[in-house]
Every structure is written in structure tokens, then in C-alpha cells.
Regions:
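Acidic helix N-cap motif at the loop->helix transition within catalytic regions
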Residues: 10-13, 36-46, 87, 91
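Short, acidic, metal-binding catalytic loop of nucleotide-sugar glycosyltransferases
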Residues: 17-26
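A conserved acidic beta->alpha catalytic loop
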Residues: 18, 33-42, 59, 83
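Short aromatic/hydrophobic "clamp" motif used to bind/position activated sugar donors
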Residues: 79
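Conserved nucleotide-sugar donor-binding catalytic segment
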Residues: 124, 129-213
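C-terminal subregions of glycosyltransferases and related glycan-biosynthesis enzymes
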Residues: 197-301
Length: 301
């Protein structure tokens, strides 16, 4: 499995502990140090775990390149990816690999919950079915927790070409679209990944993402207006009403009249996200709570 990292020693060690605690599966762990200036390499080596190797880039090359470097060095039959600030449940890998093998699927994902900067459980919702996820990929990226979730057959990863290092924002989305050509993934519906939300994630580079969305359109037939609406919704989730209105307005200007009403709601409602917020589904609350024990354990030093 592959973990790219740069200057996040503390978070990385927590992520690594969740990896090294995986049950009933053989592990090869490749930490790709993408030009760290802190003591990340020494901290990883201090674990003295023979399953862990550090590959270092003296100059930062970006997350996509780091992931590809790790995948190229991996010797296993499956490749799993984990961002250095996320954590896994102890049975995450074995359940995904077993499910993929039983279904003869080339890739797999699971449910995910959100945690805060201190590792406290914030919430979550059940993952989409494989059919819904793949059907929506040209419109929205519904993969819970992104790359930290997915396990891919190594041969399929390599034949897909790996992550596009030219895409700074949407390389994950591009990869799922390419993997979908091999068939639907299999889903383990329980929450097995915890995705960390940071204050820094409150901003989005809308211009850069739209530019890359055009690449997805040209490469995969992605619906550009749907992606604009998805970006606007992402702004609303972060409470960035002005940016959401702008994103909807650009969609309207490009001929997407469906966004006109959404722009009005975003502009006029004092708390735009509340306009569509529904009471939590008791089943989803129970589903999320099922992750609390392992999330709490992963947050411990």
C-alpha cells in the first residue's frame, strides 16, 4: 500500500499505525516522502517495522507522481492508497480484497466517515452503490474519502496508466473514470475509512478545477455543467455563499438554466446549506456510530 506525505509527521504516524494494525493480510507499506523538510523519514524509520519502506523525492513532485512512484515500487497483487491524514479500520483491507476476489472485481471501495483535526467523529452517510457511483462519474465524484478508500488490482492500476500528474485537483476523479472501463467496483458498505476535514479545506480553486473538468469532458465525456453544479454545491457545504453564486452563475451563462434557481437560493437564503438540510436518518446515525470505537482508537497517540 502507498502513502504519499510531505511535512506532516504527526498525522502520518497515526495513518501508519492504522495501516500496520490491519488484520489477516500481508502488507508492504511504501511511504513516499515528497520533499519533506521535517524529520518525517527518521520518524518512519523509528517504527522499526520491516513492512515499511521510505522512498524519498528530494524535490516535491506532487501527490499524483508520489502515488505513481509508490505503485511502481509495489510488489503485491493489490494496491491500496491512503492520504497521510486519513485512517483505516483494522479490517479495511482484508474485507475489500476478499469482496473484490469473490466478485471478480478489479477495484473496491467502502463506506467512509468524517473526522475533525483531532480525530473526533463528525458524521457520515452510507456509500453509493457501485451502479450509482459509476453512472454518476461523468457528473459527480461520489467516491467517499477519495483515494484513501480505493483498493485496485495492481495489473489494472498499471495498465490504466496511473494518476495523471498534470491534474492537480481532479486526478482521483480521472482515475475512477478510467478504472470504470474495467467494470464496476465492489462496495463494502460498512464505514472502514475516516476522512479528515481541515480548516484549509474550506477553499476551492474553482478556476483550476473547471480547467481540469474540461480535460475530463474531452477525455471521458464528462458533463461540464454538472461539474459546475457540483463545485457550487461544494462551496455551499463550506458556507461560501458568494463563491457558490458565482459558480451557479457561470453555469447559467454557459446555457445551464437549471442552475438559475439554485443561484437564487444560494444568494437569498441566509444559511444556504440549511435550505436543503434534512433531519438525519436514524439508520445513517447508527451506521456512523458503528465506526466510533475504531475511530477513537486511531486518534490515540
Amino acid at each position: 500500500m502507498v502513502i504519499p506525505t510531505r511535512d506532516r509527521r504527526g498525522l502520518l504516524l497515526r495513518a501508519l499505525r492504522s495501516v500496520l494494525s490491519q488484520r489477516s493480510i500481508e502488507l508492504e507499506v511504501l511511504v513516499i516522502d515528497d520533499g519533506s523538510t521535517d524529520d518525517t523519514p527518521d520518524a518512519v524509520r523509528s517504527l522499526h517495522d520491516p513492512r515499511v519502506r521510505v522512498l524519498r523525492h528530494e524535490v516535491p513532485r506532487g501527490v499524483a507522481t508520489a502515488r505513481n512512484a509508490g505503485a511502481a515500487a509495489a510488489t503485491g497483487t493489490w494496491i491500496a492508497l491512503l492520504d497521510d491524514d486519513d485512517v483505516w479500520a483494522p479490517d479495511k483491507l482484508v474485507r475489500q480484497v476478499t469482496a473484490a476476489q469473490r466478485a471478480s472485481a478489479r477495484w473496491a471501495y467502502a463506506g467512509a466517515v468524517e473526522i475533525d483535526g483531532e480525530g473526533r467523529l463528525l458524521g457520515g452517510e452510507r456509500p453509493p452503490s457501485p451502479e450509482v457511483l459509476v453512472h454518476q462519474l461523468t457528473r459527480r465524484n461520489l467516491m467517499p474519502a477519495g483515494s484513501s478508500n480505493v483498493v485496485v488490482d495492481a495489473a489494472s492500476f498499471r495498465s490504466s496508466g496511473g494518476f495523471d500528474a498534470g491534474l492537480r485537483h481532479l486526478a482521483d476523479w480521472d482515475m475512477w473514470l478510467r478504472l470504470a472501463r474495467y467494470g464496476h467496483p465492489v462496495c463494502v458498505p460498512e464505514p472502514l475509512v475516516a476522512y479528515r476535514l481541515h480548516t484549509a479545506q474550506a477553499t476551492l480553486d474553482t478556476r483550476g478545477m473547471i480547467a481540469e473538468a474540461r480535460v475530463l469532458r474531452d477525455r471521458h465525456g464528462a458533463d461540464l455543467n454538472s461539474i459546475r453544479r457540483w463545485l457550487a454545491w461544494s462551496h455551499l457545504r463550506r458556507g461560501r455563499r458568494r463563491e457558490a453564486v458565482g459558480a451557479y452563475a457561470r453555469a447559467v451563462a454557459s446555457g445551464d438554466l437549471r442552475s438559475a434557481g439554485r443561484a437564487a437560493v444560494a444568494a437569498l437564503h441566509p444559511r444556504p446549506t440549511a435550505a436543503r438540510r434534512r433531519p438525519p436518518n436514524p439508520a445513517d446515525v447508527e451506521w456512523t456510530e458503528s465506526a466510533r470505537a475504531w475511530v477513537r482508537a486511531a486518534a490515540e497517540d
